[in-house]
Design a protein with these regions (language model features):
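Feature marks extracellular polysaccharide-active and adherence modules
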Residues: 13-15, 34-36, 43-44, 53-55, ...
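Glycine- and acidic-residue-rich phosphate-binding/metal-coordinating active-site segment common to enzymes
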Residues: 96, 102-104, 108-111, 115
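Beta-strand repeat architectures
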Residues: 1-9, 19-29, 39-48, 59-66, ...
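Intrinsically disordered, low-complexity terminal regions
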Residues: 1-21, 91, 110, 115-116, ...
Length: 207
């Protein structure tokens, strides 16, 4: 795959849960994986469009730079971690720590996500159409979180924020690109209260 010409198409069959499939791609190619994968599928992706017709193990799209990844099933923990760009669409549920330390990636989850998601998330958008576990957005920076369902609890320095017309437009664009037919008006927005950016001894118990 790494020597592929632009717009080439690849089909991977019977992946059998193997690890590190379609990792480090750096060209405008299309990859379809028919089946479920193990750890780190599509990690460090750049430019490529990838579709997984199954579920994925931990670390899918870790440190993704650009391109698009669609997961038709569920994703294990820390999906999209440290991602700098591109779009990750998970049609099922995502486990804990989804989008931790994200740095520009857009993550759309049609189902639910687990605890500690968007921990130290710096930029980008995390969109959840279902429910969210404990400690959402703990120590978050400037990433934006949109949730349609319930949130069990918010992490340190994460608060609910107003959804402006601009935010609704951005949300509608990403939902449309993900082929998810939901109204932006049904979502709540969460982000940083910006109180823990600099260490203050009076806030010690909040860290």
């Amino acid at each position: 795959m790494h020597q592929s010409k632009e717009n080439e198409k690849w089909l991977v069959t019977n992946p059998k849960g193997n690890h590190a499939l379609a990792v480090g791609l750096d060209n405008f190619i299309n990859v379809k994986i028919d089946g479920s994968t193990g750890y780190y599928c599509a990690g460090m992706n750049k430019k490529a469009s990838i579709q997984v017709n199954g579920s994925v193990g931990p670390g899918v799209a870790e440190n993704m730079m650009s391109g698009k990844l669609i997961v038709e099933g569920n994703a294990s923990q820390y999906a999209g971690a440290t991602g700098h760009g591109g779009i990750l669409v998970i049609k099922g549920n995502a486990s804990s720590r989804c989008g931790i330390s994200m740095k520009g990636i857009n993550i759309i989850v049609k189902g639910n996500i687990g605890h500690m998601s968007a921990f130290m998330a710096q930029s980008g958008k995390l969109i959840v159409c279902g429910d969210v576990g404990d400690s959402l957005g703990d120590s978050i920076y400037e990433a934006q979180i949109f949730v349609k369902g319930s949130v069990r609890s918010l992490g340190s320095d994460c608060i609910e924020k107003e959804v402006s017309t601009k935010h609704k437009h951005q949300l509608e664009q990403l939902l449309d690109e993900s082929k998810i037919n939901l109204k932006a008006s049904k979502f709540k927005r969460y982000g940083s209260a910006r109180k823990l950016y600099n260490f203050d001894i009076d806030n010690l118990s909040k860290y």
